[in-house]
Amino acid sequence: MGKMTDDGPVVKDLVLIGGGHSHVYVLKMFGMNKLPGVRVTLVAKEVNTPYSGMLPGHIAGHYTWDECHVDLRPLCTFAGHRLIHDEAVSIDYKNKRIVLKNRPPIPYDAVSIDIGITPAASVAGALDFTTPVKPIYGFGARWEALLERVLTTETQTRVVVVGGGAGGVELALAMQHRMLSELQKAGQPSDRAEFKLVTRGELMPTHPAATRATFRDIFASRGIELVEGNGVKTVSKGTVELSSGRKIPADECIWCTQAAPQPWLAESGLDVDNGFVKVSPTLQSTNASGVFAAGDCASVVGHPRPKAGVFAVRQGPPLHDNLRRYLLGEALVDFTPQKTFLGLISTGSKHAIASWGSLSLGGATSTGAMLWNWKDKIDKKWMKMYQEMPEMTAPEPEVAAVALAAGPATIAALRAVPMRCGGCGAKVGASVLSRVMARLDIPTHPSVDIGLDQPDDAAVITVPPGKVSVQTVDFFRSFVDDPYIFGQVAVVHALGDCWAMGAEPHAVLAIAQVPYGLEPQVEETLYQMMAGATKVLAEVGCALAGGHSCEGKELALGFSVHGVAERKSLMKKGGMKPGQVLILTKPIGTGTLFAADMRAKAEGRWVSAALTSMCQPSAAGAEILVKHGATSCTDVTGFGLLGHLVEMCKGSNLSAVLDLDKLPILDGAEECLKLGITSSLQPANVRLSRAVANQNEVSGNPRYPLIYDPQTAGGLLAAVDKDKAEACIQALREAGYSTTCRIGETFSNLPAVATAPEQLVYVQDAEHQFASSGEGKIRVKTVTVDNCNTGACEAPSKFTSS
């Protein structure tokens, strides 16, 4: 994470857009057989990609969501690739840059597109009044919402499926099977759901007559009306009008036809065939060198084929081979796709029909059951290739053939990398730095008298009259492979101390370290990281007033923060009062999640949700806490929830009760703990367990280890008077801190519970409840917290009250 590459500095960038069937093969193979000097980056709108062959089985209820989706994050982690969770919206192939929806463009030396297809808009009302099957990565959720609507409606639901190809047939039968099963479970009559299938031509026109006849019989036996030779003219709310003029009542309309390519492919200037990227048999664009495409979004010149998953799967190996050849400067090889393929088409229940040439067999028979089992094994075997990764040992780095192909200037630059200087000789070059600063939209603040708009030896900042200056610093190495996201997290983390004090950050000085490498790669990495940081700074009204940059082994970023506040409004750790409510604004669990992510054990959706939380600034949260009279506050970071709560207890000469059952926890954190995965800082944090008065009672609770979990860019922990707590929590939730909740309470003592003076916290759960009684005060004793120099945690040299 944050390294150059596994085999030295980056020479060339290969970017894969989309996580389709072809690309998952390419991702794995570039991980199994690395090309030294090549950095592989996946740009994916969704971090979980569905396998189309198992989608009908999932709809029918035979597979879980996880069983039929490839999780792209563990796959990328295993292979050592970068993952950018965003959507491509254009390619500037002349300047070799990919334009993304929510962040700055990224460069490439070679790019491949495998993004599937999207619903067509040629039929009036289709986009507004139907549930589209394409793109398939979102259909599972759309189907579950549809199913919920049907099951909660007391009247009959009329479902119309539009599309008579194999996909529409499979989905119609799968949906009916699942819907009838769910109605039966709920004790409701089966006639609550009525199905029709509409197709412009005959049913399954590319399959043999015997297959069509078998499916017509199945439709008839299942009570599904089949409307052939009648296309859809318009779709409106509650009605599907056909080209014949017939109007079919439809409470739900499933659109499984007329899928189209994404418009930006043609808008980018690429050669297209009806909007699909036109590629030669090598899978390279016919007019843009270095641009490749595969799967449904591509059209191979001279080899037209149906839009089917089997062709995308088969394109994976030749695509991987030609991408390697292109990066090595070798001749590309033509690929001729197969003309026919064996279709194993499911019937909703666990039966299937085999369709090959003129051959057709199976159905609701023992043969059909056998074919289903065969299909099931084939599909699960394919999924297993991308869900279970082998252990790998990295080979010794060699002179990269990629560098040789790039020419003598690149080779000379690479030879200089091992002999990089220290001291000021380690600084990023002035020309690189100047270009990066020119590309950034640098935020300013009125209090900055001398900053980057008129650079000098130091920044000059005015402290407004009546205010005090608040200073803090944070720095750590990257724990994610995306410099843009890392820049956001790093600045949110650094500003957290300022917000926790109730101060307004006015300016920061950046300390940036980028991996050694060729000048273009160093520039781009520094730019992406600082673009992420300045995005957050602009959002919260804080200036980037200056900084320092250098080269090193890993990506790292920190900030010296200058803020201001009114002295009387400062929220100090020592400001708690007895009887106050403890409020936490963000969920915990980042330590175990990213420790698991490093091992390719964390699910992509867990990590994405965690990063969303970590990128959320606490500026608005701090304002709300001040408004509701919070007397004490801290940001929960490297020492974990317990460590920072103990700091507040010691500073306030109080004790606290912490409720495990009420802690907001990030999705997947408990699952990662069950795997025995914790942060490298966790053992040091656990040494503070002596501060827990009842640790022997509560340590068996599976949530208990999370109070020691080190957080990066964590939330605010604040003490608020009871009569203001509910209004404060509600305001925080409305401001976007959706998991905010009451997690405990402050006390002047822990009577009949604490047996040692350092026992400041009682941790309760459903089985162990604290009851306040007794007399006396808890004596404060300093508890030493040992630190370790790890990545995603608070800087070890941070001065605290510990």
Name what the model sees in each region:
Residues L83-S90, H177-P281, A331:
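A Rossmann-like FAD-binding core segment of flavoenzymes
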Residues A401-S802:
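Helix-biased detector of long, well-ordered alpha-helical tracts
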Residues D128-T155, G238-E241, K247-R314:
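FAD-site-proximal beta/loop scaffold in flavoenzymes
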Residues V10, S349-P408:
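C-terminal auxiliary extensions adjacent to catalytic cores
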Residues G2-V11, G80-V160, G187, I254:
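FAD-binding core/adjacent interface of flavoenzyme oxidoreductases
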Residues C297-S346:
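A conserved FAD-binding loop/helix module that cradles the flavin
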Residues G2-R82, A120, V160, A166-A209:
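Beta1-alpha1 glycine-rich phosphate/pyrophosphate-binding loop at the start
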Residues D114-I115, V123, C256-T257, A294-C297, ...:
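Short, well-ordered coil/turn residues at beta-beta hairpins
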